Regions:
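Surface beta-loop-beta hairpin patches that serve as ligand-binding interfaces in beta-rich domains
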Residues: 6-62
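Acidic Gly/Asp/Thr-rich repetitive segments characteristic of extracellular carbohydrate-active
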Residues: 20-36, 41, 73-106
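N-terminal extracellular ligand-recognition/capping segment immediately after the signal peptide
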Residues: 86-93, 100-126, 131-145, 159, ...
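Short glycine/acidic-rich loop motifs that flank beta-strands on beta-rich extracellular proteins
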Residues: 101-102, 114-118, 137-143, 163-168, ...
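All-beta strand scaffolds that present successive hydrophobic residues in beta-strands
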Residues: 107, 126-131, 151-156, 265-268, ...
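Surface-exposed loop/turn segments connecting beta-strands in extracellular beta-rich domains
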Residues: 114-116, 123, 136-138, 152, ...
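Ser/Thr/Gly-rich low-complexity blocks that favor extended beta-strand/coil architectures
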Residues: 161, 186-245, 385-421
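Long, low-complexity, polar/charged, intrinsically disordered or flexibly structured peripheral segments
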Residues: 214-285, 290-292, 297, 428-429
Length: 430
């Protein structure tokens, strides 16, 4: 067993020295002038307020008397003992969306199983609140699809998949000729489930880990193999895989061009059987989305996916490894992936760890001006996924496409939109 974690308080100088020795940071010569300008001007501004991180409430659930309707899910056939609560909840949500005013959807204590995606569409002023409740997905698909919702809140849940699409094992043997690695799997991982495809990875990854004394945890080994079959760039490093249920072992074979390097026996490895297939929370064309006091332990792709969302607020909503589990990966892609969003995006007091791809990927795009005259201009987006809605009162900035210098700033006074194109009237002559 690895050594137990010990909490040690470090002086600022010790932290800086530790960061310089971290395997993910490049080193600078002792006399490097570049080193002088590294980091923040005030190192004391860095840190975590543990009390705020664990307890601060920024978006509280109103008192029950403030709601026009309160829905206890048990009264609508939604119970922890059900094998699949998705059908009953989807029916209830169709009723809820026709009710005006503040609505409270309560999940009392328990583990609620869902075998399909739950769809929240065209709903305003809804609080989805777990009271020591877990939302557990038993199918490999998105947990929630939220579209065209406004003032939408998710509070107080744990979210997980059973089974999750990642497994953890320890290297027990390798075969140079076959370019293969055999892992002894942890007891919690049952790969007899058909979704594991007998051990062969269609889309997913193989990642080796190393024990880090500083963090008291396994972290990705920068000198080890990270190989994958990608849904995005069509890379295929993992050409074979087989699960032996009797021995509880998994053997992965690598392609000839994968850069195979046999790991040492005892190396910890995480293997995932999804990559980008399913976002866990799919927010699209929503306004004022709030998530607070939630823990997410696994996802089958990107975890929080936001397209064309105005104002996103997340507090104490963690993407973290589940305590007691041997899993080493949380999200098989990005933690938070935002595309074409606008307004506020505020994430506070939250932990994002062990994702396969970016912790946060905030994508931003631009419109291209095609013509202008007087105080009007025509501009357009390159695609629907990069199409920001432009509205009266918005401030737009015009940049030189070659130098990226700011040319001028205007306020929009009139908008005519047609598909991806916008005819804008602004507050002064262009």
């Amino acid at each position: 067993d690895p050594p137990q974690k010990e909490v040690t308080l470090l002086e600022k100088e010790q932290v800086i020295d530790a960061l310089e020795r971290d395997i993910y940071n490049r080193s600078f010569p002792a006399d490097s002038k570049e080193k002088e300008f590294m980091g923040l001007s005030d190192a004391n501004a860095v840190g975590v307020d543990r009390d705020r991180f664990e307890n601060e409430v920024l978006y509280p659930v109103p008192d029950e008397e403030d709601f026009v309707a309160v829905y206890d899910v048990r009264e609508y056939g939604i119970f922890p003992e059900n094998k699949d609560n998705a059908p009953a909840l989807n029916i209830l949500l169709k009723q809820i969306k026709n009710v005006e005013g503040l609505k409270f959807l309560r999940f009392p204590q328990g583990v609620y199983l869902f075998h399909a995606t739950v769809n929240f569409a065209d709903i305003e002023d809804l609080y989805v609140v777990g009271e020591d409740a877990e939302w557990r997905m038993t199918e490999w698909t998105s947990a929630m699809d939220i579209r065209n919702c406004k003032n939408f809140h998710i509070n107080g849940f744990e979210f997980d998949y059973h089974p999750a699409s990642t497994v953890t094992g320890t290297v027990i043997s390798t075969d140079e000729a076959k370019r293969s690695v055999t892992l002894k799997l942890g007891e919690e991982f049952d790969m007899s489930d058909s979704r594991f495809n007998g051990g062969k990875v269609k889309y997913g990854s193989y990642m080796e880990y190393v024990w880090d004394e500083t963090y008291g945890a396994y972290i990705p080994d920068k000198d080890g193999m990270l190989r994958y079959n990608s849904t995005g760039d069509r890379v295929e490093n993992l050409v074979g895989g087989s699960y032996d249920p009797a021995a509880h072992t998994l053997t992965i074979a690598f392609s000839a061009d994968s850069g195979y390097r046999a790991p040492d026996e005892g190396t910890k490895v995480s293997v995932s059987y999804t990559m980008y297939e399913y976002g866990m929370f799919m927010f699209q064309s929503c306004e004022k989305v709030y998530m607070e006091s939630n823990d997410v332990y696994a996802s089958l792709g990107m975890t929080f996916v936001t397209y064309n969302v105005k104002d996103l607020y997340m507090n104490r909503t963690n993407l973290r490894l589940r305590e007691g589990s041997e899993r080493l990966m949380t999200s098989t892609a990005d933690g938070l992936h935002a595309n074409g969003c606008y307004g506020d995006m505020i994430v506070t007091n939250s932990l994002y760890e062990a994702s396969h791809d970016d912790a946060m990927n905030i994508c931003s795009f631009y419109n291209t001006v095609s013509s202008y005259a007087g105080n009007t201009l025509v501009c357009g987006a390159s695609s629907a996924t990069t199409n920001y809605p432009i509205m009266e009162g918005d401030v737009i900035e015009i940049y030189d496409p070659q130098s990226m210098e700011l040319i001028e700033t205007y306020t929009v006074v009139k908008v005519t939109a047609l598909g991806l194109s916008y005819d804008l009237t602004v507050d002064k002559r262009i």
